[in-house]
């Protein structure tokens, strides 16, 4: 079988020249989607067959569902389940072996609170995901955000802080513990640093992010991100082959300034 790190969505989706930083549409070879909405409750089921690059086709499919419930106008809770019914990919282990990606399961729960403590425009948000595959794999990831925005004012400014963490693999244990980011992506949220994303992706990392945004025009949004990256484990097998082992947990910082210009609603 193929022994490789999971391809990032910018490589495995939308064809061989997807142009991640231009925010192209996401495409799949096959998609099945069911949405059910009952008042403030939304239930979604899905099956996804990614449009992978033909030369690197891993035959990986995803199936699962989401449930979101707006408990009150200021409290929203939800959960997501994803499984991989088919995949030819495998994860490399420090000792030279590998474990299959097929059969992996992920369960995540999330919470969002708006206008916290009566402060208009404030919000707190968090999510935690557990990941497993029988007795061979145990991984996890999570994030927490605290922020404030002023949608009714000029330029609609916002300021937020996010801490995110993704488990790495400890070579001293029998289980594989490096988090699989699945189809995580999207320039707005989970491309954590234009350079660092290419090097490390969303695995084996603690990431601090401070973000400021503004809308100087109706179709233009400016976003400034400040990142600090810390590796959880010095073993990074599963990322870039040249970085299988790190010398330090402190891997770097990055500042990103991005402009999003919407030409039209289409």
Predicted regions and their residues:
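A short alpha-helix capping/helix-coil boundary motif
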Residues: 9-12, 188-190
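Short acidic, glycine/proline-rich loop/turn micro-motifs
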Residues: 9-11, 89-93, 235-240
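Signature for the C-terminal beta-barrel architecture of outer-membrane proteins
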Residues: 13-175, 210, 215, 228, ...
């Amino acid at each position: 079988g193929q022994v490789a790190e999971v391809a990032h969505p910018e490589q495995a989706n939308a064809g061989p020249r997807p142009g991640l930083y231009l925010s192209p549409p996401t495409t799949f070879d096959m998609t099945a989607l069911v949405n059910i909405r009952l008042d403030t409750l939304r239930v979604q089921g899905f099956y996804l067959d990614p449009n992978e690059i033909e030369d690197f086709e891993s035959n990986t499919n995803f199936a699962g569902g989401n449930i979101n419930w707006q408990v009150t106008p200021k409290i929203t809770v939800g959960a997501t389940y994803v499984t991989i019914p088919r995949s030819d990919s495998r994860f490399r282990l420090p000792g030279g072996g590998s474990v299959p990606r097929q059969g992996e399961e992920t369960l995540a729960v999330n919470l969002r609170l708006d206008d916290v403590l009566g402060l208009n425009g404030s919000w707190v948000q968090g999510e935690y995901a557990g990941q497993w595959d029988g007795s061979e794999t145990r991984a996890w990831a999570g994030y927490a955000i605290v922020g404030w925005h002023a949608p009714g004012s000029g330029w609609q400014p916002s300021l937020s802080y996010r801490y995110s963490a993704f488990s790495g693999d400890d070579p001293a244990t029998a289980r594989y513990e490096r988090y699989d980011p699945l189809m995580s992506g999207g320039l707005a949220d989970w491309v954590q640093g234009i350079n660092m994303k290419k090097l490390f992706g969303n695995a084996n990392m603690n990431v601090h992010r401070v973000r400021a945004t503004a809308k100087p025009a109706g179709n233009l949004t400016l976003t400034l991100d400040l990142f600090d990256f810390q590796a959880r484990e010095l073993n990074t097998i599963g990322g870039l082959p040249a970085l299988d082992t790190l010398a330090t947990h402190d891997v770097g910082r990055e500042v990103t300034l991005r402009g999003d210009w919407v030409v039209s609603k289409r």
